[in-house]
């Protein structure tokens, strides 16, 4: 049996990310065999991972990348969640998020579900994530997934602080002319959180709901019935300016809209996506 030294424990900890006590127990069980100790940590960790799945995992990071395609470019953004920001900011967690992103690109995945079933070496991404949960000692999961394509795709990754990984990723697809203002548009998406590209993209039920609320509010305020329709249209336009990207006032110059930016360069935006850590569907 090999001696279980502090150096040996440190080596296995660095290789696996497991806690000191778990590493010491694994090395003792493996009689000092490093490879066997890693197997024990992995096996026990995966078994424990199932117990963590009920916990909230709303911290994390977003890995993003733009790749060239036959028709232009495609942008990917993948959210990887952990329970704490302590784990989220570790180099190993950030590195793993980049690996998961790579699997998404390799598989040309179109959704989080497709990504989980994609190959990860000799395994699947789903199993790789379960193994990661074991190593980090927290519930780890793939969260939001975004993919857009166009002649040009611009990505902006926002960090809330220097020591933290990206917590917001904004992507926008444009034609070639629109590429000139794509970065400014991506900054706008990150900061202002638009939900739709044009007002035509807003679902009819959402518009009708806003119309009803605006009507009821106007009547409750005692506005004369004959002018209520005009007031309602004004409030709907204000709603569109808030949620529609191309109608939002440009943050750096509110005298113009984001749509005006593209008109000035003779370009167009064709799609966009925004992913923010912890803002996906409730678990």
UniProtKB/Swiss-Prot annotation:
<protein>
    <recommendedName>
        <fullName>Elongation factor Ts</fullName>
    </recommendedName>
</protein>
<comment type="similarity">
    <text>Belongs to the EF-Ts family.</text>
</comment>
<dbReference type="InterPro" id="IPR018101">
    <property type="entry name" value="Transl_elong_Ts_CS"/>
</dbReference>
<dbReference type="GO" id="GO:0005737">
    <property type="term" value="C:cytoplasm"/>
</dbReference>
<dbReference type="GO" id="GO:0003746">
    <property type="term" value="F:translation elongation factor activity"/>
</dbReference>
<keyword id="KW-0648">Protein biosynthesis</keyword>
<keyword id="KW-0963">Cytoplasm</keyword>
<dbReference type="InterPro" id="IPR014039">
    <property type="entry name" value="Transl_elong_EFTs/EF1B_dimer"/>
</dbReference>
<dbReference type="InterPro" id="IPR001816">
    <property type="entry name" value="Transl_elong_EFTs/EF1B"/>
</dbReference>
<dbReference type="InterPro" id="IPR036402">
    <property type="entry name" value="EF-Ts_dimer_sf"/>
</dbReference>
<feature type="region of interest" description="Involved in Mg(2+) ion dislocation from EF-Tu">
    <location>
        <begin position="84"/>
        <end position="87"/>
    </location>
</feature>
<dbReference type="InterPro" id="IPR009060">
    <property type="entry name" value="UBA-like_sf"/>
</dbReference>
<keyword id="KW-0251">Elongation factor</keyword>
<comment type="function">
    <text>Associates with the EF-Tu.GDP complex and induces the exchange of GDP to GTP. It remains bound to the aminoacyl-tRNA.EF-Tu.GTP complex up to the GTP hydrolysis stage on the ribosome.</text>
</comment>
<dbReference type="Pfam" id="PF00889">
    <property type="entry name" value="EF_TS"/>
</dbReference>
